From Swiss-Prot:
This is Cytochrome c biogenesis protein CcsB. It comes from Thermosynechococcus vestitus (strain NIES-2133 / IAM M-273 / BP-1). Its main location: membrane. It is found in: Cellular thylakoid membrane. The lineage of its organism: Bacteria, Bacillati, Cyanobacteriota, Cyanophyceae, Acaryochloridales. The gene is ccsB. May interact with CcsA.
Amino acid sequence: MINAPVFRRVLALLGDLRLAILLLLVIAIASMAGTVIEQGQSLSFYQANYPENPALFGFLSWRVLLALGLDHVYRTPWYLTLLVLFGASLTACTLTRQVPALTTAQRWHYYQEPRQFTKLALSTTIPQGSLTALATALRAKGYRVWQTDTQLYARKGLVGRLGPIVVHASMLLILLGGILGALTGFMAQELIPSGETVHLQHIVEAGPLARIPQDWSVKVNRFWIDYTDAGEIDQFYSDLSIQDAKGQEVKRGTIHVNRPLRYGGVSLYQADWGIAAIRFRLNRSPVLQLPMAPLDTGGKGRLWGTWLPTRPDLSAGVSLIARDLQGTVLLYGPKGEFLTSLRTGMSTEVNGVTLTLVELVGSTGLQIKADPGIPLFYAGFALLMAGVIMSYVSHSQVWGLQENQRLYLGGRTNRAQLAFEQELVAIARELAPPSQTTAVDL
């Protein structure tokens, strides 16, 4: 059984604003580290970019980086623990501060004596003022009014007291979305040649509770690139089919950058491309195919190449180089000398053999992601915007008391003091007899 005093102390500690600010600061720093440091890269990448001597900032080497989990910040136990603690702090703050404030705001009572009005920041006395006229004026300005024969209470903007609770609830939704995504989400990368079908195999990141779908596969019906007049890439496209375990198509769509295909909570993004193979004929042979591999250019562009034997004993051949899918291939001899260029459908003679270029086969690079927390993210941000707007609504209260042919009027608000004062002054002047000058004492 939970000890009540201990529970209250823990609740008070978690609800401390200073703790919430500290947790938020640490989360922000950790998130910045996850943004600056490349996530999910290979060991060799971190060894090359974060050497031990000299270490970055004197301490951040690849060993420290991996030990702290900075290569996958958002899935580390300590980062998720920070999110849970911050969520607990928000919950405690809501229960100990915001909910009691809302409950107090909903409680009200009539003022029964004139001296009670002196405690209000805004109050005045209207000779021969009418309580009924006051109620009518307040209703016209959107107040909800309760009254007896001699007493009145009115309020509006109670939703403003609900705003902070909605903001806290939205932040909890966002945190829950982040935790759910880290635990159950995954990301895969696949490089698939046109016409091929694959299951998800190359998993880059996955949460401990992630379920990788194996009951469907992805088929690339076609991959193509649109080029500008200058020969630069304008956009690349993939015509994809989702197939069930029996090979039946269950969904089809064409994707390009920033326009994914979604199926079963999984999004398939166009992320990269390559040249998978070259198809050709030698003399009158059937169409043959050789795979092409990316070449190391030292950062000077992208090239793909392969070696084509022109003799059965592999004693002679040519190197084929391509830089894009526009259909041009460069041929080089055994000593690296340039021989000729060849376009799709054209032929040339090499080492006594007629080589005909049929086509270059492109491959599409897909980034495949599942994040079950995204709906909670969207709901949380929508709720956050609503809560912020609600928080800007002023909660205004007005009391009235009619006694000895005098109307005592007073009120208070939690924000927009000047606007409330002007509103109360206007009401007081409306109720005052023509011969009287009424002012609100501050």
